[in-house]
Amino acid sequence: MSKIIGRTTATPVPRSDWNQIDETKVDFIKNKPTNIAFISEEDNEDIVVVETASPYAGTIHRFTVEVNCAPMYIPEDNLGPEFNDDYQPYTDYGVLIFPDSYTDKGNKTRLVISAHGGGGTVSADSSQAEFQSISRYLVANGYAVMDVNGLPEQYAIDKGNLRLQDSVGSYLAMQSYIKAYNYCMENFNFHPEVFLVGISEGGITTTNIVLHTHIPVLAQAGWSPVLDTYNQIWLDPWPWCSVNGPGAVLANVYGFEPVESPASTKDRDKWIYDEKKIMGYNPMKCNVTTGADGLEYRHYRCPVKFWHCMDDETVRYEPTEAFIKSIQNAGGTAYLKLYETGGHETAYVGDPVPNPLGNTIAYDGTEIEIKPVCEETFLFFKRFE
């Protein structure tokens, strides 16, 4: 069993002398994990073992993965030996935030994949995850948090300066998350099973991780999630992104046919949406059947809980409601909490929680304001530890 106590240069000492450790050699940090060292008590032993913690503990680690951005859709008339797959490697950025309690050996740390929304990115030197309340709260309570951009920067430039924020949960994004997950498992001391949290456009990313990857997921949470490539991204994208926004990313990544004489400069008028080319990466069309009773039945491989505001005009709540109901119809574990008001800012609905269950001091030493959806996400994950 391990007890994290603080910085120490002390050598192992008998248990009877724990209270006599030279205070000049120990900087005690009470009731708060630290990234410096820990003392572990071996069963049936009268020795205190002092070990130095990982240099990654309490740090933000940046990394890259290589993504093959060659087109993936194969037309029916190209299934013969004449068709050759291609390799077009691009670099995508990743971020990994370690809790103070992380160690290179011994007890494993739980990893959370936190997929950024359409207002954030992961770059060479920054990420949305570092500033989100849920990421900071999870890290403060012993979780590691990982994200990637999901749309390689140079690829976005080569395709006409696509919005870097819009990974749209595509097969390119799935490659990036799979490779980032494998990187984390191969190089760090993490449990293989992860939690997922996605905010806004991060909702379609995390949902496609569940539907299209081998990553083992304990549970998924989503705030105001995007779930429908056609109705939410193509027909009704966020108001400020109708031109060269997520629709343009869909068109370029999936190879939509261009319109010869577009009716407007809007993305939805410049290309022809093709559900077949989406190849199942539209969650609303994936893994769902309609029963004789007219109801939709969706088999989903992990528990899921979404939060959404009914007056959200950026990402409508109705697809979220339909998605959750289809999982419930099939006997799955799925929950939806709806707020009457709050718009697209689910994260800020309600008064701060007066007595959060977890530690609220972030890795930078600041106090985290915990709103209801943040606390409820934390508690939801705790159910499946």
Residue ranges and their predicted role:
Residues S40-K105:
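N-terminal cap/lid segment of alpha/beta-hydrolase-fold proteins
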Residues A124, N231-E296:
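Mobile cap/lid helix-loop segments that gate and shape the active-site cleft of serine hydrolases
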Residues E321-I324, Q328-E385:
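C-terminal catalytic histidine-bearing segment of alpha/beta-hydrolase fold enzymes
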Residues E186-N187, P192-C241:
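Primarily recognizes the serine-hydrolase "nucleophile elbow" in alpha/beta-hydrolase
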Residues F306-H308, D312:
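Short beta-strand/loop motif that positions the catalytic acidic residue
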Residues D166-F188:
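Alpha/beta-hydrolase active-site loop
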Residues D104-K108, G117-A156:
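Short substrate-entry loop that stabilizes the transition state in hydrolases
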Residues M1-N35:
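Short, low-complexity N-terminal tether/leader segments at secretion or assembly junctions of large
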